[in-house]
Amino acid sequence: MSIRPLHDKVILKREEVETCSAGGIVLTGSATVKSTRGKVIAVGTGRLLENGSIQPLSVKEGDMVIFNEGYGAKVEKIDGEEILILSENDILAIVE
């Protein structure tokens, strides 16, 4: 299945989190924290401005980003893989 975001939406695949602590302890269950880093796998056409023009997004496919997983993030499963759909405004930084 293929998925294409609309407007200012971005689709991310969450980066896997280390399952060991810095001291070498294996973390399980509630001790693990979900990563707020992800790889951009698709971007929408851009943000629609009040004057009717479209502003292109700052992120592009392949970018590694840090995001804010707030109320606006939508988690879906596509072909068995978990993806996140969020607005570009929820992306805090591009990791270079």
Swiss-Prot record:
Domain of life, source organism: Bacteria
GO cellular component: cytoplasm
GO molecular function: ATP binding; metal ion binding; protein folding chaperone; protein-folding chaperone binding; unfolded protein binding
GO BP: chaperone cofactor-dependent protein refolding
Keyword annotations: Chaperone, Cytoplasm, Stress response
Quaternary structure annotation from Swiss-Prot or TrEMBL: Heptamer of 7 subunits arranged in a ring. Interacts with the chaperonin GroEL.
Family of the protein in this entry: Belongs to the GroES chaperonin family.
Role: Together with the chaperonin GroEL, plays an essential role in assisting protein folding. The GroEL-GroES system forms a nano-cage that allows encapsulation of the non-native substrate proteins and provides a physical environment optimized to promote and accelerate protein folding. GroES binds to the apical surface of the GroEL ring, thereby capping the opening of the GroEL channel.
HAMAP family: CH10
Name this polypeptide is given: Co-chaperonin GroES
Source organism of the structure: Haemophilus ducreyi (strain 35000HP / ATCC 700724)
Primary gene name: groES
